[in-house]
Design a protein with these regions (language model features):
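N-terminal leader/linker segments that precede catalytic domains of diphosphate-processing enzymes
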Residues: 1-56, 60-116, 125, 134, ...
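Conserved cytochrome P450 K-helix/beta-meander segment immediately N-terminal to the heme-binding cysteine loop
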Residues: 128-129
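A short, charged helix-loop
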Residues: 137-158
């Protein structure tokens, strides 16, 4: 999976969205000799937006930050204490709109060979955890329902349960997009 992403991401034409605001997230892939895992966070319950949601570390692009990689690495260091030098950037995934369509989010796939001790920023991050990629590849682990929100256009919302956490929404769409770029493809169509 890692080699296929390393080769494919820099060469492929990715979808770029123009929106009034931009954000970036780091999609950390842990490859430390054990099973491949994706690193995620659960946001604290008292945040003004996306409280309690499972998410990748990330945030808004700051003025003067013209590179989504810089934003994703900065946010990962701020939110979970992941030093940028521990991340090998594999490439950029397609941009995704937020539900309100006002923000374009650029996911940055990054490889972590040796996971350091992580320290969550407790004001934003309630928990840091990892999901084995092999589990994410199993179609029977995913559920979905029709998105009935405004502007959904028949889109489905996908859900993945893991150790009491629910991966869904934008984060689930990013995971499924990442998996679609691997030789095995996405477990959900």
């Amino acid at each position: 999976m890692i080699e296929s992403l390393r080769e494919a991401l820099p060469r492929r034409a990715r979808r770029r969205l123009e929106r009034p605001e931009r954000a970036a997230v780091l999609v950390p892939i842990i490859d430390d000799g054990g099973p491949l895992r994706l690193l995620l966070t659960r946001r604290t319950e008292d945040l003004p937006t996306h409280a309690g949601h499972v998410a990748f570390p990330g945030g808004f692009v700051l003025p003067g930050e013209d590179d989504p990689v810089r934003t994703a690495l900065r946010e990962a260091e701020e939110e979970i204490g992941l030093p940028p030098e521990r991340v090998e950037v594999l490439g950029l995934l397609d941009d995704f709109p937020t539900r309100t369509d006002a923000v374009a989010v650029t996911p940055v796939a990054g490889l972590i060979r040796r996971l350091p001790e992580l320290k969550p920023q407790t004001a934003e991050v309630a928990r840091i955890f990892a999901i084995p990629v092999a589990e994410l590849m199993r179609p029977d682990r995913w559920t979905s329902r029709a998105d009935e929100g405004p502007g959904a256009g028949g889109r489905r919302i996908h859900f993945f349960e893991h150790e009491g956490e629910t991966l869904w929404g934008l984060s689930a769409r990013i995971v499924l997009h990442l998996l679609s770029l691997t030789p095995s493809g996405s477990p959900v169509t």
